[in-house]
Amino acid sequence: MRVLYDNPFSPFARKVRMVLDHKGLAYEAMDALAPEARDRLAAVNPRLEVPVLDDDGVVIVNSADIVAYVEHRYPERPVYPADPVRRVRARAWERRADTLLDAILHDISVFLWAFPGSTPPAGLAEAAREDLEALYADLERALADGGPWVCGDLSIADLALFPHLTGVKLLGVPFTEERHPRLLDWYRRMRKLDICRGDVARVQSFLAARAGDQPALQHIIWRGDRVEWLLARGFHEWFLGEIRAGRVAWPRA
C-alpha cells in the first residue's frame, strides 16, 4: 500500500503528487497537516513536515528524496533527463525551487495568511522582487536554450517550479508578456497539463473549504532556507524581534 502524507497547499507535497500522477502510480493521500492526522504524521516524521511517502513500508521524507526514490524504484515515465548535463540542470532547478523560491514566497506571504494586517519589515517586498526578477530572467534564458520545457522534455525542473510559481501573482511580482514571454508561455502550457490542472483544482478546493476559517496563529514554524534568505537579505533585527516576541518556533529535530 502506498500512502502519501500530503497537504494540498504545500508546494513540496504538490510536487511529489504530480510526480506520482505523471508516473501513473496509485496512492492514498491524506492531509497530514490536519489536526486529527498529527499523531500519524509524527510517527513517520517527528518534524511534522509534509510530504512523507510510505511505499509499502519504505518511509521516505523530504520531497527531493521522495522523487529520487520514486524515479529509481519506478523508472517508467522518467522525471529526470537521461542526458547527464540536463539531469544536473534539472536537479539544480529543483533545488532552487525548493530553497530560494520557497523561501521568498513563504517569507512574503506569511504576512498575508499568518498575520493578516501586520506590517512586513521595510524593504522585504523590494528584496523579494529583486530576487524573483533575477530568477525569472534565468528561466527565460533556460527556456530559450532548451525548450519546450525548462530542461528539454518535461522534468522535475518543471514540476518543482510550477507549484511555487502559481502564487507569485498574488504577491504582486508576476511574470509578464513584455519581459518574460517564454516563461509566461511555459506557465500557460503547464496549466494545460492534466497533472497541473488537477493540482490547481485541489489547491482551489482546499482554499475554498477553509475560506473565512483561518485560525489566529501565535507563532510560525521557521526552518533553514526560509531563515537563511531573511538573514542574507539583512533582516536580522526583525527576525530577532520575532524570536523575542515568541512568534518563532522551530521544527523538531
What do the PLM-derived regions correspond to, one by one?
Residues N45, T119, R179, P215-A216:
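Juxtamembrane helix-loop transition sites at the ends of transmembrane segments
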Residues K192-A209:
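Charged/polar, low-hydrophobicity segments characteristic of intrinsically disordered regions
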Residues V58, P84-V85, L154-S155, H180, ...:
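Short capping/connector residues at structural and topological boundaries
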Residues A42, E49, P116, L171, ...:
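A generic membrane alpha-helix/interface feature
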Residues M1-E130, V150, R226-A253:
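GST-like domain detector, emphasizing the conserved glutathione-binding G-site
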Residues A97-K192, G198, L231, P251:
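GST-like fold's C-terminal all-alpha helical module
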Residues M30, S63, E178, V200-A201:
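Residue-level detector of family-conserved "landmark" positions at structurally sensitive sites
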Residues Q204-W238:
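Long, charge-rich low-complexity segments
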